[in-house]
């Protein structure tokens, strides 16, 4: 089987190369925004008009004549920015993402080369079109044939992400166990075998410092040197928060994936669960402050990324991930199967009102998720996407985040 894998390395460019890379990233951003504006204008004139990469790519020479400095950027990188827009529209129509937005300077500055690059791992250097040879920190051995290179700027440092492809044998998972996983706010992940992974809450840890930095930024003169310095501090802190979260997720998913051949999770619609409860001017929302805190905790813990990592790591290890309907998983008694809201009146405790069974609520949820996974394997029960809602006791949530 073919395996695609990405490796990320820090680049060590010269000052001239840094200026050129900023220019190339800016050119790609301009082309992306012009293409999106053109597409929107065409759709306004004719609402049956569909996005076509070929049509927009044919406009690229005309844009280069209008803006001569676009000719300084590599043609491949400009074409790949149009490919990115094509992918954005494809994800939008597949309901995987929002409608494409215009790119802002300083956010996600990057460009990609699908060919024309060279890599010398033994010499710790990369050749990129129009940039020449660049040194990089060879922090890990790279396997496979390089397919493309994406150069990106983050926190003032340039990175090269190299996607590789290689043939591997169909893996066989060393374990034979199956486990249910329940994700939550108080506990990040609870397994049906009783193992618990506590929440790291990286944003909550740094929230006070972030607020202090943002208040200091508001007192600076915009675009002054002090403003830029303070802006850099905020960007670096956001990067630290993201790195703490990413590190914890990788360690957690690796541990679970290595020890269990089959993992059963809830098919949660994270985007729907983390929507704002403010409502509209005519119809105000309820428990807005509590819902805001819940949304912040869900996004802080990275439930979607947790599932994504589990799925690809299980595929690489020869295991599998089953997503089941989360409806009533935290309200069903695993002993007598009685379903009632009264079974779980608090965040932590589950007490069945019929048979008296009592246990930790998250553990009960994980046991029920495992049972639902067995039902899928035995009977082929399908997941109901439109009913994928996780039930949490409103009283406890309100008290915790009000």
Set out the residue ranges of the language-model regions:
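An alpha-helix initiation/capping motif
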Residues: 49-50, 54, 76-79, 83, ...
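Long, hydrophobic, amphipathic alpha-helical segments used as structural scaffolds
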Residues: 36-43, 89, 93-100, 166, ...
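Positively charged, helix-rich recognition surfaces that bind polyanionic ligands
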Residues: 5, 19, 130, 138, ...
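Gly/serine-rich nucleotide phosphate-binding loop at the start of the catalytic core
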Residues: 1-78
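Short alpha-helical "patches" and their helix-cap loops
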Residues: 42-51, 98-107, 382, 386-389
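Acidic carboxylate diad motif detector
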Residues: 54-157, 279, 296
